[in-house]
Every structure is written in structure tokens, then in C-alpha cells.
Amino acid sequence: MPLLDSFTVDHTRMNAPAVRVAKHMSTPKGDAITVFDLRFCAPNKDILSERGIHTLEHLFAGFMRDHLNGSDVEIIDISPMGCRTGFYMSLIGEPSERQVADAWLASMEDVLKVVEQSEIPELNEYQCGTYQMHSLEQAQDIARNIIAAGVSVNRNDDLKLSDEILGKL
């Protein structure tokens, strides 16, 4: 099985909260696609709550589009990581890590402005596979933690696992 890009970086050295360009690629017509690792918490040290990350999934996707989409950027998808330490965001375009970090922080401010759980988008059995597994309070706790910590940048060159280490794993 091929080694995926996300497993060639040292998770023990990742800062969080932090944004990282996980991958650059191009469509056959030349459009740039960028995948970002939006690391909310340090791998193997902390984990996002099940209900909190699910509620963030519903809120974050819309808020990030509000703050980042424009003439040169269009978000394709924002999905939670299976390890529950963050989200992957795929988009058309090449915004800077700082632009993404600023949009992320603005989105967290938006999460704090949601007053009631009933305001969570697609919170019903028709549009959500686990519509009862939500917590606005937990999502807002996560947002407060991100705002308080600020968002830094993780660079692939700083996190790259050596061929020697990869060979031993």
C-alpha cells in the first residue's frame, strides 16, 4: 500500500492549533488544489470531543466559506480527521497559511455567536447521519480554546520523517 503524505510527517512534533499545507496538486486543466491540515489539538496528547467535533463540522464548513471563499479560492470540503485532532480542508486555489489561519480564527468567533443548538445547520435526521450527537457547548469550548491559543503554522520541512525512520516503522 502506498504511504500517504499525511503519514510522512512527524506527529510528535506538530504544534497545535496550527495550519499546514498537506498537499498541492493540479487538475488536468491546471487549476490548483490545496489540502490543508487544520490541527486543533496536539496528536496523541489531546482529542476533540465526539459531540463537539461533530457540531463544529456543521458550523465550521459554512463559516470558513464565509471568510475564505473569493475570486481565487473556493472550498471544496472540510472534514474531521478520524483521529479527532483536527480537520482537513480541500480547496481550489492557493491561499497563504496566514489567510487560512485568519479565516479559522474568524470562524471560531462565529461559533461563539451561535446562541442555541437549534441554529446548527442541517441538524435533523434527513440531513445528518447522527443528528442527536451534537453539543453547541462543547463546540464553543473548542472555539474558545483556539482563540485563546491563536493559530500557528506547521511546515512540512520541519516535520518530515527521515527515510531512515520511515524504514523502521
Curated annotation (Swiss-Prot):
Binds 1 Fe cation per subunit. Its cofactor is Fe cation. Keywords: Autoinducer synthesis, Iron, Lyase, Metal-binding, Quorum sensing. It catalyses: S-(5-deoxy-D-ribos-5-yl)-L-homocysteine = (S)-4,5-dihydroxypentane-2,3-dione + L-homocysteine. Fe cation binds at H54, H58, C128. GO terms for molecular function: iron ion binding; S-ribosylhomocysteine lyase activity. Its EC number is 4.4.1.21. InterPro entries: LuxS_sf (IPR037005), Metalloenz_LuxS/M16 (IPR011249), S-ribosylhomocysteinase (IPR003815). It is an enzyme of class 4 (lyase). One of its GO terms (biological process) is quorum sensing. Involved in the synthesis of autoinducer 2 (AI-2) which is secreted by bacteria and is used to communicate both the cell density and the metabolic potential of the environment. The regulation of gene expression in response to changes in cell density is called quorum sensing. Catalyzes the transformation of S-ribosylhomocysteine (RHC) to homocysteine (HC) and 4,5-dihydroxy-2,3-pentadione (DPD). Belongs to the LuxS family. PANTHER family: S-RIBOSYLHOMOCYSTEINE LYASE. Homodimer. This is S-ribosylhomocysteine lyase.
